[in-house]
């Protein structure tokens, strides 16, 4: 039989196989494609993009793959939207072991994770994480032959406590089936380890199963994928990685490590006070935002910032002295924040009253909120959004525009990039005996006088705090970009 049209000197393996009871020539090419002809049509599967794994069933080899839901066919080199699982079965006439060896060798060369620690948060959002994991996530990992250690979180900070003491050598990565909260716990736990430098090499993956899902939305949206569990899981299986900036929020000796955002004023009030409507799911945000805009609060205070190049004209010149902790060995106490000296640089300031202050590390704050459209994962800067005053009807329109990111084009919005930031929060303009809430990554960072009381304990006092950023400090599983 003439095989020239299928073979070239760089092919890894080629041979005659049965596919659906018909003889065909199957080739694994050097660039990682399985190619064959079926019913007169040339077909292919990309080992990198389509194939999850394979199993042997008697004389047959069953290749586990994912295909684009809209495509309807086996050819699926380019993805967009949801994926569906699809098997490709063939039976080699000879050398089944050779096929298995070459397939395994190629998959192993891709550097995909083989052992993952998985946190499932059964309490987040609509409490659907367990079901999402069992029905959508676990089957994909099984197809890819990934070994899982599953930990259901039982209380707040459970994930943080676990990663602080775990043996990092046991895993190739960590997966959070939750909203953004478990991701933040994991990052803080890794950074508080004595071996934080080594621990941070462990990539973290997210599967959306909570209320916010801002980080995974930002990652998937970058390459045009929908924010859904199977897209996120497949991105983890493929094993591509990218670095992400980590912000250190400090008040005296107290520190919190943020990968998403810090908010004060309107946005923090909506995020935290809407917890009483958690049963509504993500709709609680829109519902409570309307209430808060109707009864709009304005806060006294001051912000100072170190602008990125090109943003030096915003605000007024100011001097700023950041708190510097006495030098101690980070081998004993964990990560202490970036070591950059900021005091002699050209700081700027803005004074209140403010409606809201929003500091963002990635583009999306949630699945429906494109807070900072110009934000980058590892540029070493945070995106600062300032709203000082705004008519209520205009503000309602701006809140709707956050779904597309066009709110930052408003003349009422100041949108800049900063390297460091200081917040000096004050009381409400109309109620001087009432203060506000400072929110970071969806958690209460500080709570002032006469504010909404919730189950979350504040880490810091309602006072001056500083934010610095360390470029590309943490590692995330990511779609290929």
From Swiss-Prot:
Q: Which GO terms describe its molecular function?
A: ATP binding; D-erythro-sphingosine kinase activity; phosphatidic acid binding; sphingosine kinase activity
Cell compartments where the protein resides:
Vacuole membrane
Name the SMART domains for this protein. DAGKc
Q: Where does substrate bind?
A: 178-181, 271
Q: Does the keyword Transferase apply?
A: yes
What sequence ranges are listed for the domain DAGKc? 111-253
What keywords sit in the KW lines?
Answer: ATP-binding, Kinase, Membrane, Nucleotide-binding, Stress response, Transferase, Vacuole
* One GO cellular component term: plant-type vacuole membrane
Stored PROSITE patterns? DAGK
Tell me which Gene Ontology terms the entry assigns under biological process: cellular response to abscisic acid stimulus; response to abscisic acid; sphingolipid metabolic process
Per the record, membrane topology reads: Peripheral membrane protein
Active-site residues, record numbering mapped to chain: 180
Q: What is its main location?
A: membrane
Q: In which tissues is it expressed?
A: Highly expressed in flowers and siliques and at lower levels in roots, leaves and stems.
Q: What is the annotated role of this protein in its UniProt record? A: Involved in the production of sphingolipid metabolites. Phosphorylates sphingosine and various l sphingoid long-chain base (LCB) products, such as phytosphingosine (PHS, 4-hydroxysphinganine), 4-hydroxy-8-sphingenine, 4,8-sphingadienine and D-erythro-dihydrosphingosine, but has a very few activity toward D,L-threo- dihydrosphingosine. Is required for abscisic acid (ABA) signaling that mediates stomatal closure, inhibition of seed germination and root elongation. May function upstream of PLDALPHA1 and phosphatidic acid (PA) in an amplification response to ABA that mediates stomatal closure.
State the name under which the record lists this protein. Sphingosine kinase 2
- Give the organism the record lists: Arabidopsis thaliana (Mouse-ear cress)
Gene name of the record: SPHK2
